[in-house]
UniProtKB/Swiss-Prot annotation:
Tagged with keyword Hydrolase: yes
Record-listed substrate binding positions: 66, 116, 160, 167, 191, 243, 261
UniProt protein name: Glutaminase
A GO term for molecular function: glutaminase activity
Species for this entry: Pseudoalteromonas translucida (strain TAC 125)
A Pfam family per the record: Glutaminase
Gene encoding the protein: glsA
Gene3D superfamilies: DD-peptidase/beta-lactamase superfamily (3.40.710.10)
Subunit structure: Homotetramer.
GO terms of biological process kind: glutamate biosynthetic process; glutamine catabolic process
Reactions catalysed, as given in the entry: L-glutamine + H2O = L-glutamate + NH4(+)
Family statement drawn from the similarity comment of this UniProt entry: Belongs to the glutaminase family.
NCBIfam families on file: Gln_ase (TIGR03814), PRK00971.1-1 (NF002132), PRK00971.1-2 (NF002133)
Amino acid sequence: MPTTDYQQVLNDITQEVAPLLSQGKVADYIPALAEVDPEQFSIAIYTTSGETFCAGDCTQQFTIQSVSKVMTLTLALQRYGDELWHRVGKEPSGTAFNSLTQLEFEKGIPRNPFINAGAIVTCDALYSRLSAPMHTMLETFRALSGNRCIAIDKKVANSEYEFRHRNAAMGHLMKSFGNFENEVDDVLWAYFNFCAIELNCIELAKAYNFLANNGIDNTSGKRVLPSRQTKQLNSLLFTSGLYDAAGDFGYRVGMPGKSGVSGTVLAVLPNKFTVAVWSPGLNSFGNSVAGIAALELLSKKLDISIF
């Protein structure tokens, strides 16, 4: 479909999902997120040719939460390559994103890098190689998004850190199996700061556009990941990016994706575009009600899929 049609499609989708904005529930287990107005929506496409299309609350920033895990993995792969997979797996979990039972059963090796335990151990790996992990993460998002003012919402980071106990339990459990190198609380502080980075949908789609462009940032022309690793990362996003709703998302949307409890969803159509959508009301799986519906509509209207 010609890119000139994208704007009208996004406008139509924004109107069609409007009745869904009152559905779902914001993530109230993180006090700072519980204060967000649930009836907000934005969606943006950033193409591999550098075109931007957006509808809804395009300039509204939000914390990206678990969508940051994709960049954590990217930075870790840059520094470890395949060595990283000795510490974290590549399989779908089929359980809740913060499950301790599965982690115990599999002797401290998380199923994949997108469940909490997997992201935390990936963050631990980064912590071992970076002197200033939060600075590196911020600078990466600033460079890839084109916004040098990207910042961390410290209120959200502090709120998540205060209620870190289950995530801390995962870290200590992995440490008991010899799969954790640094102080758990130090790593969690970095992890929650990554989650509390604020972008809008345009910035988010642009920052991750290298996933649709064979690993190359099309603004700078610099390679972020080798082409093969980019394909592998997209494969993991398809199988595990939406936790135990990944299969349903793959069936309905047909693209690799990653969600976050702020109501953010990122999706990738290789060689075409990245799309970011945000709407805070969540379903029982912790995914955005309007966001998932919007991406399904996009897939149908453009007749797109990776298959």
